[in-house]
């Protein structure tokens, strides 16, 4: 089907849905039609803008052929033609992007997990830096950042930390952060001024609701134990720590941050549900293609995606070959939008090639 025919078909469908909604339908039929109508609104607006520009260009070209036009009018028409010819490819691209298959998880909130990798205490300190960076980014975007669990080292580092980030389209913005983040800097304890390299792993999961993932009680094994602090000593006299294992998948989540066993269980279930949902998403994607789609690079969490070089003041994303020489703005202030927007644009460009 030609591109123009496809657009006409979408406009017809949108008009038919509008007529259907105004005809007085009720119940499930109304809900279904309303959902379809709302989903088409954005792409229809872009199609109409594209068609309008095409129509105006055709009119301008026809007008230019008329006899007896003075030079001033001719120049004005040529300027209009030039502007329209330049805008059409951009408008066409906007339509194609709007037509790309949507990831159902994009509109969801997210759970982010940061773990120290290779590099000992320096890796744990870097994990804390990354976790705080995402917290600041969430604040800039107006999202709600709720810490779920932190396992600290006692001197400012995090062995691992997780948080729930709630807001519109959070997952669509943060999903490309999954992977290995590498840091190059001189540790405070380094007397010779040598640069050390360490790493931390980031995992971003769409936050799943109960309607997305139904977990049966019979599929869970729940163990309780006493919470322990640094050095392994018990910090609570009651069994407030919780370990939940999802028996069918073997996925396990342990939590001991709260003094209340009930709160630890609720948070652990939230993380568990997100991990199971992400696992199901991956299986579906792998069934559709040999390599994962809907991710920049392979999407493998073992893939090194970004380097933070403090001596040079730069942050480099290896997937899109983008380097920014403003490490403080990115790391300390959470100004990640340049990377986020470039990664989304790169992802869209790759998907457009498949159309």
Curated annotation (Swiss-Prot):
Methylated by PrmC. Methylation increases the termination efficiency of RF1. It is found in: Cytoplasm. SUPFAM superfamilies: Release factor (SSF75620). Pfam families: PCRF, RF-1. The modification N5-methylglutamine is found at residue 233. Residues 282-293 have a biased composition (Basic and acidic residues). The keyword Manganese does not apply. It comes from the Bacteria. One of its GO terms (cellular component) is cytoplasm. Keywords: Cytoplasm, Methylation, Protein biosynthesis. Belongs to the prokaryotic/mitochondrial release factor family. PANTHER family: LD18447P (PTHR43804:SF7). NCBIfam families: prfA, PRK00591.1. This is Peptide chain release factor 1. It comes from Rickettsia rickettsii (strain Sheila Smith). The lineage of its organism: Bacteria, Pseudomonadati, Pseudomonadota, Alphaproteobacteria, Rickettsiales.
């Amino acid at each position: 089907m030609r591109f123009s025919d496809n657009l006409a078909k979408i406009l017809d469908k949108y008009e038919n849905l509008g007529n259907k909604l105004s005809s007085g339908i009720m119940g499930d039929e109304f809900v279904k039609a309303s959902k379809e109508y709302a989903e088409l609104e954005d792409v229809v607006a872009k199609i109409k803008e594209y068609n309008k520009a095409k129509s105006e260009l055709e009119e301008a070209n026809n007008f230019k052929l008329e006899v007896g036009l003075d030079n001033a009018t001719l120049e004005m028409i040529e300027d209009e033609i030039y502007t329209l010819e330049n805008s059409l490819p951009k408008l066409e691209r906007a339509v194609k992007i709007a037509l790309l298959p949507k990831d159902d998880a994009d509109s969801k909130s997210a759970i982010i997990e940061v773990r120290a990798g290779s590099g000992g205490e320096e890796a744990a300190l870097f994990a804390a830096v990354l976790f705080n960076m995402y917290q600041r980014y969430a604040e800039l975007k107006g999202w709600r950042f709720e810490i779920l669990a932190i396992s600290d080292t006692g001197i400012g580092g995090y062995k691992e930390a997780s948080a729930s980030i709630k807001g519109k389209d959070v997952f669509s913005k943060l999903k490309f952060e999954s992977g290995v983040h590498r840091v190059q800097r001189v540790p405070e304890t380094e007397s010779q001024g040598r640069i050390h390299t360490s790493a931390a792993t980031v995992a971003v999961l769409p936050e799943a609701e109960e309607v997305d993932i139904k977990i049966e009680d019979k599929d869970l094994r729940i163990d309780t134990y006493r919470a322990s602090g640094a050095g392994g000593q018990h910090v609570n006299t009651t069994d407030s720590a919780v370990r939940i294992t999802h028996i069918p998948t073997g996925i396990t989540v342990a939590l001991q941050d709260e003094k209340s066993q009930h709160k630890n269980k609720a948070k652990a279930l939230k993380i568990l549900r997100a991990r199971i949902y992400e696992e199901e998403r991956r299986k579906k994607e792998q069934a559709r293609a040999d390599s994962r789609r809907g991710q920049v690079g392979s999407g493998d969490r073992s893939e090194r995606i970004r380097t933070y070089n403090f001596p040079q003041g730069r942050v480099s994303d290896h997937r899109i070959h983008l380097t920014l020489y403003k490490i403080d703005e990115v790391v300390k202030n959470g100004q990640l939008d340049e990377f986020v927007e470039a990664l989304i644009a790169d992802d869209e460009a790759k998907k457009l090639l498949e159309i």
